[in-house]
A protein has these predicted regions:
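Alpha-helical propensity feature that highlights long, continuous alpha-helices across diverse contexts
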Residues: 1-124
Length: 124
């Protein structure tokens, strides 16, 4: 539960689960596993994203955020491919923002909004 979690961990779980639920509600082709089931390297990377997104250097637009997301995934060894494959680290959204479909752009906008909510309302 949140009692033993750091501020960044609480914010990360809120943003991640909010984005996951939004993807599910939109019938997105990729709905992430729950936070509790994600692998440790992913969680560590996501904590860094949330730390940045809740700080002064945050991405303020979905396009800027998508670029940061792509960089983080490439650093974790992911590649572009037409079909999502978590085991082989292949993701169809590893393309420039302009090449994303509307659903993926909307998901990025929701993520930016969730980060802003977490930044302003989840406090110590």
């Amino acid at each position: 539960m949140w009692i033993d979690m750091t501020l960044t961990e609480r914010r990360a779980e809120f943003v991640y689960e909010g984005a996951r639920i939004a993807a599910k509600a939109a019938n997105a082709p990729i709905v992430p596993d729950p936070w509790s089931e994600r692998e440790q390297p992913f969680r560590e990377q996501f904590l860094k994203v949330i730390e940045r997104q809740c700080g002064d250097q945050r991405s303020k637009s979905p396009e800027e955020l998508h670029g940061s997301w792509m960089q983080a995934y490439f650093e974790m060894g992911w590649f572009y491919g037409e079909k999502y494959d978590r085991e082989n680290k292949i993701h169809p959204d590893l393309v420039p923002y302009a090449d994303l479909g509307q659903l993926e752009r909307d998901k990025d906008a929701v993520f930016v909004a969730l980060c802003e909510i977490a930044r302003q309302w989840i406090i110590e």
